[in-house]
Amino acid sequence: MTTSPPHVVLIPTFLTEAEGDELLARINTAADFRQNYIQLYGRKAIPRLEAWCGTWDYPYSKGVVLEARSIPDYLQALIARIAAAGFGTYNGVLINCYRDGSDYISPHSDDDYGDPEPTIPSLTLGAARPFRLARKASGSKIDKSTKFEYIPQHGDLLVMKGLTNAEWKHWIPKTKKPVAERINLTFRCKKV
């Protein structure tokens, strides 16, 4: 593994354990998780559950569009807390549920709406899973010699800033180890 990407910040215990537990319980009760599908040599399930709360329909990944749903008060409060910490304001929250080790997300960049240097906070709840980054190489490939790994814990906030998404890809790999559910909230901003 290489040195950490220069524009990534990990804030341990952004939420206390009790705050994280309460938020996790609310999300598991209230979030409208869906199993989405992409067209890739037929119809293929995206290997995680997803929910979207935002002021616009969220298009991504080979024709998948998550419909706009209002942001609940408890997430509005979290957005305000992130803003108060100096990480920007947001009008959308993508919630991914990794049910076990077979759920994952492939290497990708969050190239949000033409902003070459977006700030994208990401909050982990539940089980810790490796969050890997590697520099982009030609085409859709990554430079494996530049791989770096964080392991955000319950309540940790990881923030990608600057050129992180222009120069790096990130992912949550599969694992055969037994792991509990991990919920990840990724905060987005779009001028609407």
Report residues per predicted region.
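Non-heme Fe(II) oxygenase metal-center motifs and adjacent flexible, charged/small-residue loops
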Residues: 1-192
